[in-house]
UniProtKB/Swiss-Prot annotation:
This is LIM/homeobox protein Lhx1. It comes from Rattus norvegicus. Residues 180-239 bind DNA. The modification Phosphoserine is found at S162. It is found in: Nucleus. One of its GO terms (molecular function) is DNA-binding transcription factor activity, RNA polymerase II-specific. SUPFAM superfamilies: Glucocorticoid receptor-like (DNA-binding domain), Homeodomain-like. Residues 352-362 have a biased composition (Pro residues). One of its GO terms (biological process) is retina development in camera-type eye. The lineage of its organism: Eukaryota, Metazoa, Chordata, Craniata, Vertebrata. The gene is Lhx1. Interacts with LDB1 via the tandem LIM domains. Keywords: Developmental protein, Differentiation, DNA-binding, Homeobox, LIM domain, Metal-binding, Neurogenesis, Nucleus, Phosphoprotein, Repeat, Transcription, Transcription regulation, Zinc.
Length: 406
């Protein structure tokens, strides 16, 4: 015996209906809401049968205005993600039914104000704010009230408009004459991506571009304008912080470690007690204390160093056995004298057993040394403690080269 799925009684009729793979009496297949018989088409939810209208009314899209279901045959209007009946899609101030493509302002996601009422209320609020003693509020919220050329001048004033729109009501009594701010606007991720892409292309968009963005994102033009102003202000702050950070990095960066001076010197440089000091090889009475200025009765020149270690380095042009090589050019402004001739006579005829590789010095050196030394003592009184090869005639020229350094 077959039982009905609706009334649970056995089916004794000649005809039966098969719905949801179950057997039904013909009279039991009816809408659970309006009790109308369902002969051609039916809808089911949780084991219950519905007609088309009741099913969409109960489980279909709800109208954001009246919170009632929307029938498939009803005409609707869509604003952002909300769907409205035609009769519910009206201005909250003048109750005018809004048409498709008409500019409007959305409040609390489900209330609308037409453009005419919004602009008229904004102008009234502007006049009240001009006559009010309280200052500091934005002059106007109209998208046409400001030109993009004036945006930068008012970036700092309107940078916090979107952040302060949902503020507390503590100052309402003090700002009765001032314009009231609208609700806080929440920008969704897709809308934010569109605004960022537009900002990357044009940081300061024109009114026409803002109108296009308003149509694409569904945001009103004032919100878009304030967003661009805040974005430009943020970019300027980030550039200032990055420039300040670069200057701080350049100022506080770690200094280079100083390398030892000896490692960078050439082998011929004169460093006291250094690895290549020539004075360590010629420890004689000539370099003893007070012996540096035997040829200078008046003392050393004031501009020269006081010790041999302070002498500048003179590259050697002679053989490697001499501490300092000979100079090939005289100092400018010096001329030969009678004392220079004495040097020439002595140095031009060295002894035959002299080991010096330089039998004579060039003439320009003698003219320079005569001017530098002044009156010269006899060469017979000079002796070098370096060995027997350095005779009384001063066949080796290191002393002459030493004097030439001064």
């Amino acid at each position: 015996m077959v039982h009905c799925a609706g009334c649970k009684r056995p089916i004794l009729d000649r005809f039966l209906l098969n719905v949801l793979d179950r057997a039904w009496h013909v009279k039991c297949v009816q809408c659970c809401e309006c009790k109308c018989n369902l002969t051609e088409k039916c809808f089911s939810r949780e084991g219950k049968l519905y007609c088309k209208n009741d099913f969409f009314r109960c489980f279909g899209t709800k109208c954001a205005g009246c919170a009632q279901g929307i029938s498939p045959s009803d005409l609707v209007r869509r604003a952002r993600s909300k769907v409205f009946h035609l009769n519910c899609f009206t201005c909250m101030m003048c109750n005018k039914q809004l048409s498709t493509g008409e500019e409007l302002y959305i409040i609390d996601e489900n209330k609308f104000v037409c453009k005419e009422d919004y602009l008229s209320n904004s102008s009234v609020a502007k006049e009240n704010s001009l006559h009010s003693a309280t200052t500091g509020s934005d002059p106007s919220l109209s998208p046409d009230s400001q030109d993009p050329s004036q945006d930068d001048a008012k970036d700092s004033e309107s940078a916090n408009v979107s952040d302060k729109e949902g503020g507390s009501n503590e100052n309402d009594d003090q700002n009765l004459g001032a314009k009231r701010r609208g609700p806080r606007t929440t920008i969704k991720a897709k809308q934010l991506e569109t605004l960022k892409a537009a900002f990357a292309a044009t940081p300061k968009p024109t009114r026409h571009i803002r109108e296009q963005l308003a149509q694409e994102t569904g945001l009103n033009m004032r919100v878009i304008q304030v967003w661009f102003q805040n974005r430009r202000s943020k970019e300027r702050r980030m550039k200032q912080l990055s420039a300040l950070g670069a200057r701080r990095h350049a100022f506080f960066r770690s200094p280079r470690r100083m390398r030892p001076l000896v490692d960078r010197l050439e082998p011929g440089e004169l460093i006291p007690n250094g690895p290549f000091s020539f004075y360590g090889d010629y420890q004689s009475e000539y370099y003893g204390p007070g012996g540096n200025y035997d040829f200078f009765p008046q003392g050393p020149p004031s501009s020269q160093a006081q010790t041999p270690v302070d002498l500048p380095f003179v590259p050697s042009s002679g053989p490697s056995g001499t501490p300092l090589g000979g100079l090939d050019h005289p100092l400018p402004g010096h001329h030969p004298s009678s004392e220079a001739q004495r040097f020439t006579d002595i140095l031009a005829h060295p002894p035959g057993d002299s080991p010096s590789p330089e039998p004579s010095l060039p003439g320009p050196l003698h003219s320079m040394s005569a001017e530098v030394f002044g009156p010269s003592p006899p060469f017979s009184s000079l002796s070098v403690n370096g060995g027997a090869s350095y005779g009384n005639h001063l066949s080796h020229p290191p002393e002459m080269n030493e004097a030439a350094v001064w």
